[in-house]
């Protein structure tokens, strides 16, 4: 009997759940899980997770001490909420959870390093070692440099919002643990740019981008793992079968599970080793030049940081409203 696509994918690629929804993670039993500001905000709005939100707020209020302003309490709770979700997720997965640094720090190396250390300290205080956490940082030059320093301290990083080969090479040269090249968002850009409704999966610009990055890494023996992310359909996923990891939303995990058929391996280190690829080295000037020349990567990195910032601001508003409600309840 032919296995479903998800079972076959798991034989060649580590399957990761891209969600903050703990029930969805329990359903699909991935090895790892990834969260981002948008996913944490979405989960924080779900009725089944109000208890996590409330507990985090009440603990933050207690720790902030008497006389702390609402803003200070919300700020403290905000930092802790992603870790609260991460801790719950780590109870049900055997591997690692990715927790994102505040996207508003994406162009500030020092602030990113400080925030990453704080997140790791919170996990450590809850009994979780750094080997089970990936700190997610946007793939700006400043973010990559922050991650390079963090990796030397034993803090493992997942460089996200990655759209171009220049970003990927800079990450590999910096010794980053893992990158998340985005597939669907690249497709979105090209569809808008060309006016096309769709692309065959093998010609999908996002698929081509991740394939190029994977082949480059394997050709030159980089240890940085490639985790394709941001999928719009299962065709994009099946075209990247064989990638080190793929992080997939619950909806698409369900679709893969419900689909029976053969799944051939598309990405293969042995095949990559035979390719004729030019090796390039990336310093800041080269990075800036290549980034400016790659309009898609330039647009999508900027848009991604703005999108995550908007989600963070929405979460802060949500926490402030929730705190006010808890205080009203406490005063009665």
UniProtKB/Swiss-Prot annotation:
SUPFAM superfamilies (alphabetical): Aldolase
Print the keywords alphabetically.
Cytoplasm, Pentose shunt, Schiff base, Transferase
Q: What is the lineage of its organism?
A: Bacteria, Bacillati, Cyanobacteriota, Cyanophyceae, Nostocales
**Family recorded in the similarity comment:** Belongs to the transaldolase family. Type 1 subfamily.
Source domain of life is: Bacteria
Function per UniProt? Transaldolase is important for the balance of metabolites in the pentose-phosphate pathway.
- Organism this protein belongs to: Trichormus variabilis (strain ATCC 29413 / PCC 7937)
Alphabetical GO biological process terms = carbohydrate metabolic process; pentose-phosphate shunt
Return the EC number. Answer: 2.2.1.2
Q: Which EC class, in a word? A: transferase
Cell compartment(s), UniProt? Cytoplasm
Q: What is this protein called?
A: Transaldolase
Query: Can you tell me where the transmembrane regions are?
Result: none
């Amino acid at each position: 009997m032919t296995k479903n696509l998800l079972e076959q994918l798991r034989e060649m690629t580590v399957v990761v759940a891209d969600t903050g929804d703990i029930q969805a993670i329990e359903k699909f039993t991935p090895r790892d899980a990834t969260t981002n500001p948008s996913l944490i905000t979405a989960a924080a709005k779900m009725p089944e997770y109000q208890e996590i939100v409330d507990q985090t707020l009440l603990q933050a209020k207690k720790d902030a001490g008497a006389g702390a302003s609402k803003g200070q309490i919300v700020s403290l709770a905000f930092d802790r909420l992603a870790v609260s979700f991460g801790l719950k997720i780590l109870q049900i997965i055997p591997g690692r959870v990715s927790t994102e640094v505040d996207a508003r720090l994406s162009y500030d190396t020092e602030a990113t390093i400080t925030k990453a250390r704080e997140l790791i300290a919170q996990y450590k205080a809850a009994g979780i070692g750094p080997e089970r956490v990936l700190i997610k940082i946007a793939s700006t030059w400043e973010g990559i440099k922050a991650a390079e320093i963090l990796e030397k301290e034993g803090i493992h990083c997942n460089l996200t919002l990655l759209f171009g080969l220049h970003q990927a090479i800079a990450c590999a040269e910096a010794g980053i643990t893992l990158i998340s090249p985005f597939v669907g968002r690249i497709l979105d850009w090209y569809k808008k740019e060309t006016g096309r409704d769709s692309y065959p999966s093998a010609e999908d610009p996002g698929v081509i981008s991740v394939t190029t990055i994977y082949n480059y890494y394997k050709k030159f023996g980089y240890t940085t793992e490639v985790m394709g992310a941001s999928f719009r359909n299962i065709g994009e996923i099946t075209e990247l079968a064989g990638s080190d990891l793929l992080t997939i939303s619950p909806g698409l995990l369900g679709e893969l599970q419900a689909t029976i058929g053969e799944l051939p391996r598309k990405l293969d280190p042995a095949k990559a080793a035979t390719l004729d690829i030019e090796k390039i080295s990336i310093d800041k000037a080269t990075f800036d030049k290549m980034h400016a020349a790659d309009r898609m990567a330039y647009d999508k990195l900027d848009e991604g940081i703005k999108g995550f910032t908007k989600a963070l601001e929405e979460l802060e508003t949500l926490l402030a409203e929730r705190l006010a409600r808890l205080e009203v309840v406490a005063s009665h």
